[in-house]
Amino acid sequence: MKEVTVQELKEKIENDDDFFLLDVREMSEYLVSNLDGEHIPLGELDARIKEIEDKKDQEVIIMCRSGNRSGRACQFLGGKGFNNVANLRGGITAWAKEIDPSIPVA
């Protein structure tokens, strides 16, 4: 599975690269802190996949709290024809630790 580090994600954001950020945490976690990505909880991804089908050929970076749920989402979307998915290594926990310590993690 392809992974992206939080430093690489930060560079993509700063460079205004063309990618799609998908946050698969629960709503309660997303409301505490987020990086402005599209929010679809992992448990709803199958039912809501039509919302993101237009991203199949775009780079999709998937995040969660630590990288476990996003890893499962990467495998799921890869099996549904998404050609360029990557897991954010360490999730928002790594972002808070390495990029922005002011971000709370739920």
Role assignments for model-derived ranges:
Residues 63:
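Short, surface-exposed ligand- or partner-binding patches at beta-edge/loop junctions that are enriched
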Residues 1-20, 24-59, 69-106:
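Rhodanese-like catalytic fold shared by cysteine-dependent sulfurtransferases
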